[in-house]
């Protein structure tokens, strides 16, 4: 209201200040639709101000603030336009601090839409400037987004290395500071550390980082941070096969996205929750949640998790006996993973295709399992390597090749036991028992 009256009185400076304050307040409580409305009005007000370096700096700041609320709403097309405009403004006035900020968010945008090479380039440029400026907020943001990109590419070792640096930079009270981001980067870094370490089978470390993310988020009671904390814990349990522990955390994360109007944020939750439901026989529920999420993921929103969602849906279709659909979806997952250079999900899709082929085409299944295993070994994806050994062992058992079956099943059992993957260990032990 104050901004409205200031605007009508052509007190544009005051109107801008009021709108920025209102937008920040709405953003702080995750009222992103309200924040967007404030920042869009602020952009209109800026057009009435005389052109100067200070006005241009404000124009960058408002665009970046607007981008912060558009992302949880999944409005990606608007975001890239804002980033283009903000980068041009920062370059024009030689503002390196703001340029680094824009470049780091550009890296995040490219991660979101599955263009990781472009994202890495933008992220490295942002980090280089941040290091030169010795700016902790800029270093933390650029490094986190680079960690996200490495995770997406299946380079889990690189993701872990850079994300652990972010955690080390933000001890004690700094862990609770947002540093200009939507939630504390200490929460974000721990969430993706949990994802990355879980993919390598380091579940104890993954769960520890996930629990830390949730603890920091709970202390602030902030929806965006809470979502990340719950999905971190739930995803690790799901990848481990601890479905009883995974489902409550993931269901809570999904509720947060719905209750807080963050429709663009439920991609990883849907993938892992659907997988968890499938493992305990709730196949219809699994299909429903994954199909709903898939429909949304293919709209103008996040593409980053689409390959993972497709892998999960294909596996659930297989569990439900929908073989033809499973193969179609898994083939799409493989194609998209390869196009987006998501090597971890490429290996996962090949494993799912092996599981599908094992029903009717043993020779093809063997090739799929071996290809998936080779790539998973290269990437350090120990749980997936174990799944491939289990698949090969079952395949050889059905073919009457007891010796090879024994070798692969024993390897799977050893790996599952070392990683404390009890759900999968019991499956493998049952198959070994069938050889007697």
Task: Show the residue positions of the predicted features.
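Short, charged, low-hydrophobicity "junction" segments
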Residues: 12-21, 134-148, 264-265, 323-329
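Helix-coil-helix junctions within alpha-helical repeat/solenoid scaffolds
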Residues: 54, 63, 85-89, 127, ...
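Flexible, glycine- and charge-enriched loops at secondary-structure boundaries
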Residues: 12, 32, 76-79, 116, ...
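Charged, alpha-helical scaffolding/interaction elements associated with membrane systems
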Residues: 28-29, 133, 320, 379
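Extended alpha-helical scaffolding segments used for macromolecular assembly and cargo binding
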Residues: 1-103, 109, 316, 328, ...
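Internal alpha-solenoid helical repeat scaffolds
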Residues: 40-237
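Short coil/turn linking the two alpha-helices of tandem helical-hairpin repeats
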Residues: 10, 23, 50, 67-74, ...
């Amino acid at each position: 209201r104050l901004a409205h009256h200031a605007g009508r009185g052509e007190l544009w400076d005051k109107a801008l200040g009021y709108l920025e304050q209102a937008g920040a307040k709405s953003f702080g409580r995750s009222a992103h639709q309200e924040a967007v409305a404030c920042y869009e009005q602020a952009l209109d007000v800026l057009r009435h101000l005389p052109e100067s370096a200070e006005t241009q700096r404000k124009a960058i700041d408002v665009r970046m603030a607007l981008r912060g609320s558009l992302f949880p709403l999944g409005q990606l097309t608007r975001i890239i336009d804002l980033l283009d405009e903000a980068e041009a403004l920062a370059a024009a006035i030689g503002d390196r601090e703001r340029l680094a900020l824009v470049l780091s968010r550009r890296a995040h945008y490219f991660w979101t839409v599955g263009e990781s090479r472009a994202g890495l380039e933008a992220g490295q440029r942002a980090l280089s400037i941040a290091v030169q400026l010795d700016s902790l907020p800029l270093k933390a943001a650029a490094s986190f987004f680079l960690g996200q990109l490495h995770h997406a590419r299946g380079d889990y070792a690189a993701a872990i290395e850079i994300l652990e640096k972010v955690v080390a930079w933000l001890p004690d009270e700094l862990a609770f500071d947002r540093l200009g981001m939507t939630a504390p980067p200490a929460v974000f870094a721990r969430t993706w550390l949990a994802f990355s370490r879980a993919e390598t089978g380091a579940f104890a470390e993954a769960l520890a980082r996930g629990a830390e993310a949730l603890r920091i988020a709970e202390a602030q009671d902030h929806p965006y941070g809470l979502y990340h904390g719950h999905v971190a814990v739930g995803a690790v349990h799901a990848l481990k096969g601890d479905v009883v522990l995974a489902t409550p955390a993931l269901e809570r994360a999904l509720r947060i996205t719905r209750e807080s109007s963050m429709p663009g944020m439920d991609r990883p939750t849907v993938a892992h929750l659907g997988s968890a439901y499938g493992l305990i026989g709730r196949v219809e529920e699994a299909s429903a949640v994954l199909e709903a999420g898939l429909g949304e993921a293919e709209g103008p929103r996040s593409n980053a998790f689409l390959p993972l969602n497709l892998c999960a849906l294909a596996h659930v279709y297989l569990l439900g006996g929908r073989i033809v659909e499973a193969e179609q979806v898994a083939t799409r997952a493989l194609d998209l993973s390869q196009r987006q250079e998501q090597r971890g999900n490429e290996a996962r899709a090949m494993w799912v295709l092996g599981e599908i082929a094992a029903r009717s085409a043993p020779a093809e299944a063997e090739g799929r399992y071996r290809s998936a295993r080779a790539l998973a070994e290269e990437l350090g994806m120990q749980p997936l390597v174990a799944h491939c050994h289990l698949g090969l062992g079952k395949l050889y058992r059905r073919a009457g090749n007891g010796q090879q079956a024994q070798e692969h099943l024993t390897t799977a059992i050893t790996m599952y036991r070392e990683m404390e993957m009890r759900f999968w260990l019991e499956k493998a032990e049952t198959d070994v028992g069938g050889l007697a």
